[in-house]
């Protein structure tokens, strides 16, 4: 296996919103999708592999439209790198994975969080770190990393009762 030159092939993180980027803006408001936390999480983790952020959307995944998914697919396909992470809300992550499956010759890993990254007990840091590692070693295709597991994008579902992703 040939190791690519990191400087020539940085990892691109495309952000779409979702719980990973949610915040309370004041004590009276509901969660809202805020500025992406991906850059902060990678800096705190002292990630040295080259990466860059493409902030595409700031939406709850339940609010994503078919047009948003086409825009996501086109944005991911247009990246000059072979490795792309997509931060995404967990409720419709598998729907976006299906749309991204039409992209050939890229390793695409979707991840998100069940609790906002701004919360100390969030799974966001772990999930993003796992996606960052997975995107470097997996062959081209679409994957989802959640709950300490890597799933093929076409062989996973969110079990809302258990609050986790499961094969299927």
Which residues make up each language-model segment?
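Active-site histidine-anchored catalytic micro-motif
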Residues: 2-168
């Amino acid at each position: 296996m040939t190791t690519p030159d990191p400087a020539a092939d940085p990892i691109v993180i495309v952000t779409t919103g979702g719980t990973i980027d949610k915040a309370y803006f004041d004590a009276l408001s509901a969660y809202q999708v805020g500025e992406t936390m991906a850059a902060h999480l990678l800096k705190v983790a002292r990630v040295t592999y080259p990466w860059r952020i493409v902030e595409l959307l700031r939406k709850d995944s339940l609010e994503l439209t078919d047009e948003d998914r086409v825009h996501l697919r086109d944005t991911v396909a247009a990246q000059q790198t072979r490795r792309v992470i997509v931060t995404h809300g967990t409720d419709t992550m598998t729907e976006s994975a299906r749309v991204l499956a039409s992209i050939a010759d890229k390793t695409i890993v979707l991840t998100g969080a069940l609790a906002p990254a701004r919360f100390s007990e969030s799974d966001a840091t772990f999930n993003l770190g796992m996606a960052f590692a997975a995107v470097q070693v997996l062959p081209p295709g679409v994957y989802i990393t959640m709950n300490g597991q890597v799933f093929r994008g076409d062989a996973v579902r969110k079990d809302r009762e258990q609050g986790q992703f499961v094969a299927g």
